[in-house]
């Protein structure tokens, strides 16, 4: 009916001109007292809606929310095409069209920045960096020896492309890292996350992945597409992680392992062995979550 919605809000904070959503039975009491004009909701819950709130019936409310959030968002971070006179640009770099570089950022040699890139203040880009179109790089980021594909977002304080924690075991001789980091398209890297360059080849983060804040990804790690990795996760060197893997906060993954597709690793888990496709693991050492739960129950009864 061509209704106008001013905001997308949570149920408890919504008002008469807002759109909200319901996806969790824990908030059923809030649903009954809702003030919003309309609610994204599954059909089985519409009986709890007050008469003034119109239902927008979907099968997956949270997915609908994710899509709508991008319609409602205020896109205030996008390039205006202005390079600050306080930025430092190497003559051996190449900058394409409509690139914004804010004050005190440094673009080093052998760096190429393609169209419509935004770079915040006090960031250090290069050397040996290629940034593709429509990338957003926030303040205080450092990127070296890296390729960032299109439509990625690198949040404040991230560190990409530094040398990894590699040395010979007996003598502690440092191993020189000559590889790089590759961030594939439409991936988000959280604040203060560190991704080390490979020893020889590439440390790779797959496309459409979401890496949270304060994550450590070591040299030669390969993470396939659609990964979701929560804060304070550490992944040791040369581990390979499959598609659509989810890793909970503060989990640790040992080096030189293979984690299959569609794996879920619960928060605070310690992964010491390979994990097959479609497994859900928890605990230390990480094991099938059903076994882990049985052990927790057994120990609690002692």
Task: Locate predicted features.
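Structural signal for interior beta-strand "rungs" in well-ordered beta-sheet cores
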Residues: 21, 82-288
């Amino acid at each position: 009916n061509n209704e106008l919605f001013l905001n997308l809000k949570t149920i408890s904070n919504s008002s008469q001109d807002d759109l909200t959503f319901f996806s969790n039975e824990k908030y059923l009491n809030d649903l009954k007292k809702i003030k919003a004009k309309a609610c994204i909701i599954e059909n089985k819950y519409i009986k709890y809606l007050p008469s003034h709130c119109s239902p927008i019936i979907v099968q997956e409310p949270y997915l609908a929310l994710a899509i709508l959030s991008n319609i409602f968002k205020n896109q205030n971070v996008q390039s205006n095409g202005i390079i600050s006179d306080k930025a430092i640009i190497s003559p051996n770099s190449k900058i394409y069209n409509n690139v914004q570089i804010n004050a005190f950022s440094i673009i080093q040699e052998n760096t190429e920045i393609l169209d419509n890139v935004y770079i915040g203040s006090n960031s250090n880009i290069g050397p040996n960096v290629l940034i593709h179109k429509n990338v957003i790089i926030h303040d205080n980021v450092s990127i070296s020896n890296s390729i960032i594909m299109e439509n990625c977002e690198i949040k404040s304080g991230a560190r990409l492309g530094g040398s990894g924690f590699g040395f010979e075991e007996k003598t502690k001789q440092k191993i020189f890292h000559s590889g790089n980091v590759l961030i594939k398209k439409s991936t988000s890297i959280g604040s203060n996350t560190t991704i080390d360059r490979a020893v020889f080849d590439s440390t790779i983060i797959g496309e459409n992945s979401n890496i949270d804040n304060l994550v450590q990804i070591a040299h030669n790690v390969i993470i396939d597409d659609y990964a979701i990795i929560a804060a304070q996760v550490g992944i040791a060197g040369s581990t390979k992680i499959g598609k659509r893997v989810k890793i909970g906060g503060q989990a640790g993954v040992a080096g030189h392992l293979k984690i299959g597709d569609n794996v879920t690793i619960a928060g605070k888990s310690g992964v010491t062995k390979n994990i097959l496709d479609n497994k859900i693991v928890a605990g230390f050492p990480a094991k099938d979550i059903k076994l882990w739960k049985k052990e927790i129950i057994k120990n609690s009864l002692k």
